[in-house]
Amino acid sequence: MTYPEVLANARECIGKYCKACPVCNGVACKNQIPGPGAKGVGDTAIRNDNKWAEIRVNMDTLCEGGTPDTHVELFGKSFKYPFFAGPVGAVNLHYSEAYTDMTYNDVLVRACAENGIAAFTGDGTNPTVMEMATKAIGAAGGCGVPTIKPWNIDTIKEKMAQAKASGCFAVAMDVDAAGLPFLKNMTPPAGSKSVEELAEIVKLAERPFIVKGVMTVKGAQKAKEAGAAAIVVSNHGGRVLDQCPATAEVLPEIAAALKGTGVKVLVDGGIRTGVDVFKALALGADGVLICRPFVTAVYGGGEEGVKCYIDKLAGELADTMQMCGAHSLAEITPDMVRV
């Protein structure tokens, strides 16, 4: 199966909101929720994509040859590549009923684990979303990261218990989901967390905790203060607030602020190719998350579709490393890109 075939297959079954575009840039779906769009006009999602495209790579083939080593270590686990599938929940609402959260996560989590990476899984107002995600992670031997929404503390405790029961190697919370309307309308309301509240949640995890949705140096420092083992520089794929900067724009300053602290820096938002992955690593990220294209891969080809997309990313990353003189991820440096 080729990647164009995956996209073509997805268009037949992914539903009316997502167009399975050849380039997933947020233009066709920009203001569609339900769907992969945004609650506003969607300009942040489009900016995410545009800013990665503006960054250029500095080719330099006057170097020793060899096959690049793309392995990355994260929380004591070794992964074949420095990219991970991002979290999504309620796929039958935002995409189509060709998959439920159970069948989607079964395919995604297993395929990612079998191909050397891990999947972050989603959450939702329907309790079965987290239940199904954590069951899939448990079936994959804990190779996955349950991502909990910033609910009220009682709900978080329930979700955290499910996450820990899966044997997952880390837990995440997408704090930027505070901008989703359905969270604000809850009783008691869910949403933003203080450093003190976040610290309590970190302790509940009893394993590395990842704070997803950091867009400022101040926010990164707050996450560190609360005890986070990693952050994800993220604006929720541009879904929760218009007029935000792109993740590529803020990544360098956030990575610099956390350098040497032991807190890992991941990034998402508009990253679509192995070249984009290279750019993110050059700007200071330890790894990246990619969400929407993995949804397309599942709908377009199941486990084979996921493998096809992973192989595509891996090939592009390795080729870019070779053409820029990087033999390992540690050798990818800021001077290898032009911002």
Which positions does each model-derived feature cover?
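Outer membrane beta-barrel
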Residues: 80-89
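A gly/proline- and charged-residue-enriched helix-loop-helix capping module
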Residues: 103-152
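N-terminal binding-site loop/beta-alpha segment at the start of enzyme catalytic domains
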Residues: 90-98
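An N-cap/entry alpha-helix motif that binds or orients negatively charged groups
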Residues: 2-80, 332
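Alpha/beta enzyme core
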Residues: 99, 109-110, 138-139, 151-267, ...
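Conserved active-site-proximal phosphate/metal-binding subdomains
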Residues: 1-30, 219, 238-261, 271-339
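Structural signal for hydrophobic packing residues in well-ordered secondary-structure cores
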Residues: 49-59, 112, 116, 164-167, ...
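Short glycine-enriched loops at secondary-structure junctions
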Residues: 90-91, 123-128, 176
